Amino acid sequence: MKSSIFFKLLLLVSLLVVIFRQSYAVADYCNRDADCKRVCLRPYACNLTRHLCMCHPNDVSSSKQHCIPEHKGFGEGGPPPQRLKLYR
């Protein structure tokens, strides 16, 4: 009997953690347009009904810098791509 109550309590706590993380850990959660500035490119707006940013994502890979500044060879363009070998 005790294990059944413990199991139900564990499921309830797990469910609450999942709901909390979905609501507050999501980067595009917003209460006003200014909250979307850090995760979006212009134009951006906050959907106040759903509290989600409506925008083009501010994707790191779309920036001109495709490498980490601290790494050796940053900004040199990197080595040329290797040719693929074709097998017949």
Swiss-Prot record:
GO cellular component: extracellular region
Extent of the signal sequence: 1-25
GO process annotations (BP): defense response to fungus; killing of cells of another organism
Disulfide-bond pairs as recorded: C30-C46, C36-C53, C40-C55
Compartment list: Secreted
Key words of the record: Antimicrobial, Disulfide bond, Fungicide, Plant defense, Secreted, Signal
Main location class: secreted
Entry's transmembrane regions: none
Family per similarity comment: Belongs to the DEFL family.
Protein name: Putative defensin-like protein 256
Organism name: Arabidopsis thaliana (Mouse-ear cress)
